[in-house]
Amino acid sequence: LTFHGTMEGEIETLRKLLHYYKGNLNSRLLYITGPDSLYEDTTGKTLMVRSAEEFCRQYGELHQIAVKILRVPYLYSGTYEEDYFFKLFSTVINKKQITFEEAPAQEMHFLALSDLGDLLYKIFDNWGEGSACLQVPQVFHFTFQQFGERLAQMFPAANITYLSDVLIRDGISDDHVLRNEYGWFPKISLLEDLTEIYEDYCEKTNHKTRKIDV
């Protein structure tokens, strides 16, 4: 669920997990996945995500396991070493250089862990009958260029560039299901949370400086 993350062993892990629940008619499984299956372009990762979702559906139907699929924007952390932002902060501090693999106009699709935690509580508290596919909408509309401008304020010596000729992907549209059925919507914007993420990173890595020297 991390941006630019991998899915190594995902299908096999799902198979083992679902096999464990086979035969238990009261089992409930919530499979949380990223937005990749909704993208119009086809890549190796989008194919893997779609396959994992379909595997959950088919296995659940075959063995009568209540499966819900929750598609969310990418998660972020300042303390998880494999996270996109942990690596980004390390790069900008050590190299004073960031090259985004996205176009400046590409919107960023991210969700705060605390927002996800609130949603999970509401889903399990009001599970309902049958299987379903739920989608966390993209409600904070800001681009990589705006994000880069925010980073430039934090790291004034950093050189920030973008790939201008890449495909721009749309975010998850709001079907209002989560708001109407669970009374939930994302509350925390990544841009507002960025300073705290960086402080978490500094605490994790014992990095004392809050800004790159000019």
Please give the residue ranges for each predicted region.
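C-terminal substrate-binding subdomain of Rossmann-fold SDR/epimerase-dehydratase oxidoreductases
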Residues: 100-103, 109-214
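Conserved Rossmann-fold NAD(P)-dependent oxidoreductase catalytic core, especially the SDR/UDP-sugar
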Residues: 12-48
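Conserved NAD(P)H cofactor-binding loop of Rossmann-fold oxidoreductase domains
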Residues: 1-6, 33-34
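Active-site proximal helix/loop that lines the substrate pocket
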Residues: 34-38, 74-77, 125, 141
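Hydrophobic pocket-lining residues that define ligand/cofactor binding sites across diverse proteins
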Residues: 21-24, 60, 123-127
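Active-site beta-alpha turn of Rossmann-fold NAD(P)-dependent dehydrogenases/reductases
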Residues: 30-34, 71-73, 137
